[in-house]
Amino acid sequence: MRKIIAIGESVLDTLFHHGKPVKAFVGGRIANAAASLATMGIPTSMVSECSTDCVGDIIVDFLKAHNVDVRSIDRYPDGATPLAAIFQGENGQRDSIVNYGNYPNDRFDVLWPTIDHDDIVLFGSLYSVDLPQRERLMDLVNYAVERGAIVVYLPGFQHGISFRITRVMPNVLENLEVASIIIAHDRDLQEIFPDETVEEAFVHHINFSGNAYVHLSDSAAPKLYRGTQRASHGTVSTDSHNRLGWQAGFTAGLLYALLLHDITRDNLAALDTDGWRQLLDCAVDCAQECAASSDNCVSADYATRAATRLRDTLAQHQESSTTPQP
C-alpha cells in the first residue's frame, strides 16, 4: 500500500474558557490528520520534533496510540516541547493564542522515512516557512518530489505567532510551487495575501505549476481551483465549534480519497471536475466525523469501515490490473 509521510509541528494545546482550562490535546492539523490516516489502516509516518519531556511523551504516545510511525520524530534532550494556550473568543471574537517553547540550537535532526513513487507527503506549519527547520524540511520535500511523490501543502501557521509575512513570503511561494495540492482556510489566505480575493490569490500566486488549490471557509462550501476548473461541495465548510478537528479531518479525508480512487502523481492532472467532487465528498465526510470527536480524529467504527473499503477497493484494482485482456 502507498504511504503517507506527514511533516509538521508537535505542539500540545490547552483550551481555556472564561479564563479556566478546559482540556489539553495534541494540536496541529498535520499531526491530527496523521492520526486519523493511520487509524484508517494507512501506513503513516510523522516527521517532527519534540523534547524528551513529559509534554513530548504525551504527543508521541497519542500518535503511537493511533498507529502512527514515530521513528522520524526527533526527541531533543535540551529545551521544552511547544505549548499553546488557547483562550476562546466570545461574542464572535477570535481566539487569543499564547505560544511557549524552548528549543535547542541544533533542530529538526530527523531520520528520513522511506518515500516511494506515488506516496503522499503532507507538509506545512511554521516549519515550512521559518528557519532553522525549513532548510532540512525542504531537503526532504524536494527529495519526495524527485521520488515521484504527491506533495500536499497546508499554508499558514499557528495563529498567535507573530512575524512579518513579507520576511517569509519567498518561502511560502516556493512551497506553493513545489506542491501538487494546496489546502488552505480563509484565515490562512488572508494572512498571506491580505489584499486579494481567493480568485486573485489563486491566479496571481498559485496557478503556475498546474497544481490544485482547495479553499476552506467558515461561510461557504469547500471549493477546488485548478486552471479553469472549479468544483465545490454542497455543504458549509467548517464546524465553528471544532475548527481543528474539521480541518484535520478534511485533510485526512482528501488524502484517503486519493488512495481510494487510485489517484497517482501521473493521473492527478487528468482528474476532471466530477472526480474532484468525489474527493471533496470523501474529505467532507471525514471532516464531519473528526469535528464531532473529542480528540479530533476518526472513531474506531469509522476507521474500521474506511479501512475495509480501502482494502477491498485496492484488491479490486489489483485484480483488474492482473486480469489478462481478451
Regions found by a protein language model. Give the residues of each.
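Conserved beta-alpha-beta core of the PfkB/ribokinase-like small-molecule kinase fold
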Residues: 120, 125-200
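Conserved N-terminal subdomain of the carbohydrate kinase-like
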Residues: 14-20, 42-125, 300, 304-326
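Conserved phosphate-donor
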Residues: 181-191, 201-240
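Conserved post-catalytic alpha-helical subdomain immediately downstream of the catalytic base
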Residues: 236-321
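Positively charged, low-complexity intrinsically disordered leader regions
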Residues: 1-17
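Alpha-helix C-terminal capping segments
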Residues: 33-43, 88, 257-259
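A short helix->loop->beta-strand "cap" motif at the edges of active sites that frequently abuts
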Residues: 2, 143-150, 207-213
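Short pre-catalytic strand/loop immediately N-terminal to key active-site residues, enriched for Gly-Thr
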Residues: 19-28, 233-246
